[in-house]
């Protein structure tokens, strides 16, 4: 894991097209802004995990439906 230190208003780049800017710090929370192309999905980790779980469930349901239609 790469660990970086940034101050409010400073930005880091991920590749050539994604930038992450520290917008503010309040207590133990950090507000960040992410600029990325539309084709790059940006989610909080808990949302990403939920999406992955739902996709896996759709695959399982599709397999069940296919096996019952034989």
Swiss-Prot record:
Main location: cytoplasm
Entry annotated with the keyword RNA-binding: yes
Pfam families the UniProt entry points to: CsrA (PF02599)
GO molecular function, one term: mRNA 5'-UTR binding
Gene3D superfamilies: Translational regulator CsrA
The entry's keywords: Activator, Cytoplasm, Repressor, RNA-binding, Translation regulation
BP-aspect Gene Ontology terms: mRNA catabolic process; negative regulation of translational initiation; positive regulation of translational initiation; regulation of carbohydrate metabolic process
InterPro entries: CsrA, CsrA_sf
Signal sequence, start to end: none
Entry keyword RNA-binding: yes
Compartment(s) where it occurs, according to its Swiss-Prot or TrEMBL record: Cytoplasm
GO cellular component: cytosol
Function: A key translational regulator that binds mRNA to regulate translation initiation and/or mRNA stability. Mediates global changes in gene expression, shifting from rapid growth to stress survival by linking envelope stress, the stringent response and the catabolite repression systems. Usually binds in the 5'-UTR; binding at or near the Shine-Dalgarno sequence prevents ribosome-binding, repressing translation, binding elsewhere in the 5'-UTR can activate translation and/or stabilize the mRNA. Its function is antagonized by small RNA(s).
Family, similarity comment: Belongs to the CsrA/RsmA family.
Summary of subunit composition and partner proteins: Homodimer; the beta-strands of each monomer intercalate to form a hydrophobic core, while the alpha-helices form wings that extend away from the core.
Name of the protein in question: Translational regulator CsrA
Organism: Acinetobacter baylyi (strain ATCC 33305 / BD413 / ADP1)
Phylogenetic lineage: Bacteria, Pseudomonadati, Pseudomonadota, Gammaproteobacteria, Moraxellales
Gene that this polypeptide is encoded by: csrA
């Amino acid at each position: 894991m790469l660990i970086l230190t940034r101050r409010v208003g400073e930005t880091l780049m991920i590749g050539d097209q994604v930038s992450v800017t520290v917008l503010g710090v309040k207590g133990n929370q950090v507000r960040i802004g992410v600029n990325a192309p539309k084709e790059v999905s940006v989610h909080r980790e808990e949302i990403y995990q939920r999406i992955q779980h739902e996709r896996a469930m759709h695959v399982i349901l599709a397999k069940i439906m296919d096996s019952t239609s034989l």
